[in-house]
């Protein structure tokens, strides 16, 4: 079997994943200005209600590649209880899953399989890259490892660490829920371009920059 990879350019034309590229549609908040007060508020309320249901019933695709998957499964235990976020229903079929967690090392031979499974997922769908190997290849800078899942899949949330703790995975779920809550998708069936609006979410590093700079007393490692 011949394995091929399709590299993604998020800023260019994307025929393979047209719904996952950076959307060029108008900001829905600006569109409300040109509508009546009643219809604008009604549509806004419907979007909020649909997004609330989506973000609180995220079903993950049971797909692990390496040691990061062990940390992901740990979040399902009673200590962490990821069921609080509505994401405890593991799916064995991509057609029943809402988002895929690529937890582990994406080998070149496995990349086409990951891509095919992602294509089998139904819209709306999201991707979480978990761990240094999935983010950038990690310590495996070799021919057999893809240097980042975002080389062939659109990634919504990155989780740093080698491996990241279960708390990091749950924080990624919360960030994904926050992003889903700001999305705007068609409320009915649409053929062709659906005009999905995704908010430009700020990275955690930039969001907490002011908080880090304001720290005056640094704690020792045994106090953290």
From Swiss-Prot:
It comes from the Bacteria. It is a peripheral membrane protein. Its cofactor is [4Fe-4S] cluster. It catalyses: a quinone + NADH + 5 H(+)(in) = a quinol + NAD(+) + 4 H(+)(out). One of its GO terms (biological process) is aerobic respiration. The keyword Transferase does not apply. Signal peptide: none annotated. NDH-1 shuttles electrons from NADH, via FMN and iron-sulfur (Fe-S) centers, to quinones in the respiratory chain. The immediate electron acceptor for the enzyme in this species is believed to be ubiquinone. Couples the redox reaction to proton translocation (for every two electrons transferred, four hydrogen ions are translocated across the cytoplasmic membrane), and thus conserves the redox energy in a proton gradient. Belongs to the complex I 20 kDa subunit family. This is NADH-quinone oxidoreductase subunit B.
């Amino acid at each position: 079997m011949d394995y091929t990879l399709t590299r993604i350019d998020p800023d260019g034309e994307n025929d393979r994943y047209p719904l996952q590229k950076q959307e060029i549609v108008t900001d829905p908040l600006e569109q409300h200005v040109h509508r009546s007060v009643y219809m604008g508020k009604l549509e806004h309320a419907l979007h909020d209600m649909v997004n609330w249901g989506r973000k609180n019933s995220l079903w993950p695709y049971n797909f692990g590649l390496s040691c990061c998957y062990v940390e992901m499964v740990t979040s399902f235990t009673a200590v962490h209880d990821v069921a609080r976020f509505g994401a405890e229903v593991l799916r064995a079929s991509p057609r029943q899953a809402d988002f895929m967690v690529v937890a582990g090392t994406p080998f070149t031979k496995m990349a086409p399989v990951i891509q095919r499974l992602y294509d089998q997922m139904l819209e709306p769908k999201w991707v979480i890259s978990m761990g240094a190997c999935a983010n950038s290849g990690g310590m495996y800078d070799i021919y057999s490892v893809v240097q980042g899942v975002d080389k062939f899949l659109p990634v919504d949330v990155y989780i740093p660490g080698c491996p990241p703790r279960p708390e990091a995975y749950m924080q990624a779920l919360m960030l994904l829920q926050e992003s889903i809550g700001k999305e705007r998708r068609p409320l009915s069936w649409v053929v062709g371009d659906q005009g999905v609006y995704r908010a430009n979410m700020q990275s955690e590093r930039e969001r907490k920059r002011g908080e880090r700079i304001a720290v005056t007393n640094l704690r020792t490692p045994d106090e953290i």
